[in-house]
Regions:
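Alpha-helix initiation/capping motif
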Residues: 10-13, 67, 97
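Helical scaffold of the NTase/Pol beta-like nucleotidyltransferase catalytic core
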Residues: 1-39
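Short amphipathic alpha-helical segments
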Residues: 15-19, 66-73
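Extended aliphatic helical segments
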Residues: 7, 44, 53, 88-91, ...
C-alpha cells in the first residue's frame, strides 16, 4: 500500500491571492466539463514565493484524459494567463486525469 504524505497548511501570501483567484475562477469557467480539480504546489503553496521571481506550479486533474485539441486549448489558456500575470515568472501546468 502506498501512502501519499500530507503537508502542513501554509497561509497564502497576500500578493498572490488575486493570481490564484483569477486562476481558480478562470479555468473552470473556460473548461467547465474538463476540470475536475486544481492543486497548488511549490513556493507559492508553501508561502515562500518571491513576487516577480517565483513560478506558479499547478496540477490540473481532468475528468477524462484530454485529447490533443483540449491540450492545445489548455496550453493557449496557460500562455495567455501567464502574460496577464506579472507577479510570477511563469505558470506551469502538470496535467492528469481521474
Amino acid at each position: 500500500m502506498a501512502l501519499i504524505p500530507t503537508v502542513a497548511a501554509f497561509p497564502l501570501q497576500r500578493a498572490f491571492i488575486p493570481l490564484l483567484e483569477a486562476l481558480t475562477a478562470g479555468l473552470p469557467r473556460q473548461f467547465p466539463a474538463l476540470i475536475h480539480s486544481i492543486y497548488l504546489y511549490g513556493s507559492v503553496a508553501r508561502g515562500e514565493a518571491l513576487p516577480g521571481v517565483s513560478d506558479l506550479d499547478i496540477t490540473l486533474l481532468l475528468n477524462k484524459p484530454a485529447d490533443s485539441e483540449a491540450l492545445q486549448r489548455l496550453e493557449a489558456w496557460r500562455q495567455a494567463f501567464q502574460l496577464e500575470q506579472r507577479i510570477v515568472s511563469k505558470v506551469d501546468f502538470d496535467i492528469g486525469s481521474v
